[in-house]
C-alpha cells in the first residue's frame, strides 16, 4: 500500500522486499484523502449508497438483469425488486457512448444517484457517458 509520498511510500522504515512503484509520490492514500473527487471518496459514496435505507433492499436482493449486451464498450445491468429498479452503466471504451433506456421496455423516471465524473448527460431516457464513466441511476 502506498500510504504517502515519503520514503518507501510510508510503508516501512526498513528495506522492503518488493520495489515501491515509482508513482508513489502522486498516487497514495494521503493524496486520495486530500481530494474529494478521488477514487477513495468515490468508493465511500458507493458504499454509503448501497447501505442507505432507500436503496439497500434493491442492491442486496434485487435481481440482476444484464443490459446492452450487444453494445460494445458498455457494461450495464439493472438491479430490480418488485418496487424498485436501479441501473448501473459503465463505459469502458475510448469513445463517448449514448444509450437509450427505453430499450429496456420500461419508462423510468431517472435520477443520478452516483457518477464518477460528475458530468453525466441525461436527456429523458437517453444517457451519454464519456470514456471511463460509470453512473448509477435510480
Residue ranges and their predicted role:
Residues 7, 93, 102, 117-121:
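Intrinsic disorder/low-complexity detector
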Residues 121-138:
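C-terminal beta-strand-rich structural cap/linker in extracellular carbohydrate-active enzymes
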Residues 111-125:
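Solvent-exposed beta-strand/loop surfaces of large extracellular or lumenal domains
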Residues 1-97:
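Loop/helix patches that line or flank the sugar-binding groove of alpha-linked glycan CAZymes
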Residues 70, 92, 103-106, 129-130:
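A generic structural signal for short, non-catalytic loop/turn and secondary-structure boundary residues
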Residues 96-115:
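Beta-strand-rich binding/interaction modules
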